[in-house]
Amino acid sequence: MPQKPGVVATMADTRHVHVFDASAVLQVGFRPSPHSSLPQALMTKGPRTTPSKPLFTFKGHREEGFAIDWSSRKPGRLATGDCAGNIHVWDMKGSSWQVDSSPYRGHQGSVEDLQWSPVEETVFASSSADKTVRIWDTRGRNGPQISLNAHSTDVNVITWNHGVTYLLASGSDDGSFKVWDLRAIREASPVAHFTHHKQAITSIEWAPNDDSSLCVSSADDQVTIWDLSVEAEEGPPGDYPPQLLFIHQGQHNVKEVHWHPQIPGLITTTAEDGFNVFKPAINVST
């Protein structure tokens, strides 16, 4: 939860969604050791905390799912999506949560990703294996406000720009990613479309300190950084698009990329063989 980082939500193949308070675990993990520069938790063998019960468990999803996102605008508000195409919205009530009695329906395939609007607490976006991106408003239950045929294959991931809040980016199973202007989304034409990656896009995120920078990971074992403020060059296209600033390699099966919210340019990637933390020698912020 952005407003309380120790509170986390998990979703597994049991179809259940759990909310945990991991504050104690985080405090242990960052307690300094007097004999090492590493956190004490990394130097100590064996269990360091007792297992804790979840604060809340929701068992209403019909199938397992992957999509989950906390709202940055309304504390405790959570959206979860499953492989049956259903989306549930949660709201915190006191020390517990209240989940909507009926899900948001509209997708004809698995809900792959969810993103709350950075400015509207009732608006969220979803992407699906049905090749669409949809925009929803919790104030209405008559289906999505906007349905966009975004890609020719599954739309795996989406990211909402927190600086230029009408920009949404989507990444697909075919390795392409697109940027959409929500002010003109009914035209169904992206403002940018890139096909550098040759396998499925697995993660995508706008930089929090630079409205024009994106980080993208793919099943082709590349993590790329893009600056969309760079204009296309005249003449025949080269081997690499001019907007492509940096390629990070060396990891296998990269699943997620995240920018550090306070340190400009610092990126964390998680993969099958571990995680990397790095800062490219490029200027991605001013």
List the predicted regions and their residue ranges:
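Loop/turn segments within WD40 beta-propeller blades
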Residues: 1-5, 69-75, 115-121, 140, ...
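WD40-repeat beta-propellers
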Residues: 17-22, 29, 87-91, 133-137, ...
